[in-house]
Design a protein with these regions (language model features):
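Glycine-rich, acidic/polar active-site loops that bind/position phosphate-bearing ligands
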Residues: 1-86, 94-98, 104-260
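Glycine-rich N-terminal segment of FAD-binding domains in flavoprotein oxidoreductases
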Residues: 90
């Protein structure tokens, strides 16, 4: 391990260097010209590591835009006499890079089908899709894992950084409680989202974030979507999303067959 490393997290909590910020501004401008919405500028854990967040879009468009983002990052870095490393684990002993794929389904007139609403235990559409997704990932975790298996990513996953290499689902306490009640024969009591009281009368109550903020699960429910965190940084998102769409479609088809 080199002397200048990531143990003290001084890069993570430090300010963005002017030279890097100029690069980020040029990247934003290039992406906006291409019609690609993106945001977020901040340091990541490893020295010289940074994050960019393309904004949610329809899946086929988001995948195409993600490929363009990678190209823009490389070309813009060269203009600034820098190199953009998209390898998942370019240096041993330091954090690697990956993509977080936020996945949901929507329908005309319904909006997001993974939006729990104010009373998720009574939202039949949400619960059906939630159970179908859980079933799909449980039965086809091997396919989902294989969709992100490449040499660079294998050096990153399951090491000393999130997420683990074993596919698991995190739902949060609220949805866990609802699923457990359904398993026992139906929801017997109301399940409400917890709130945070910060002790200041002039400020409102804030909803408690139920997601795993330390990224311990590669497939987690985050508010109104699932977040697949195991995709490699140099990888196209097309294949993992194709696999996810297919296995969930199979689960929904089986549920529909049972109901019919």
């Amino acid at each position: 391990v080199p002397p200048k490393h990531q143990q003290m997290e001084d890069h993570y909590f430090g300010s963005i260097k002017d030279r890097v910020l100029e690069f980020m501004v040029d990247v934003d401008e290039a992406l906006w010209k291409l019609g690609i919405p993106a945001k977020t500028r901040h340091n990541e854990v490893a020295p010289g590591q940074f994050e960019i967040a393309p904004i949610f879009e329809s899946q086929n468009l988001a995948v195409d835009h993600n490929m363009l983002v990678m190209e823009v990052l490389r070309k813009t870095a060269n203009k600034h006499d820098m190199v953009c490393l998209l390898h998942e684990k370019p240096f041993s002993g330091m954090n690697g890079s990956g993509k977080h794929n936020n996945w949901s389904l929507s329908a005309p007139g319904y909006g997001s089908l993974l939006n729990p609403g104010s009373s998720p235990q009574e939202n039949a559409i949400f619960l059906t899709l939630l159970c179908a997704t859980i079933k799909a990932v449980d039965e086809h975790a091997d396919l989902l894992r294989a969709s992100v298996a490449k040499s660079g990513n294998e050096h990153r996953l399951g090491a000393h950084e999130a997420p683990p290499a074993i596919i698991s689902i995190f739902l949060g306490d609220l949805l866990d409680e609802i699923i457990e009640q359904i398993e026992k024969g139906g929801t017997k009591k109301a399940c409400t989202q917890k709130t945070i009281n910060i002790g200041v009368d002039t400020l409102p109550m804030f909803p408690l974030d139920a997601s795993d903020r330390n990224r311990t699960s590669p497939f987690a429910f985050t508010g109104n979507k699932f977040e697949f965190r195991a995709v490699g940084s140099s990888q196209t998102c097309a294949w993992p999303m194709t696999v996810l769409n297919t296995i969930v479609a199979e689960s929904l088809d089986e549920i529909c067959t049972i109901l019919e």
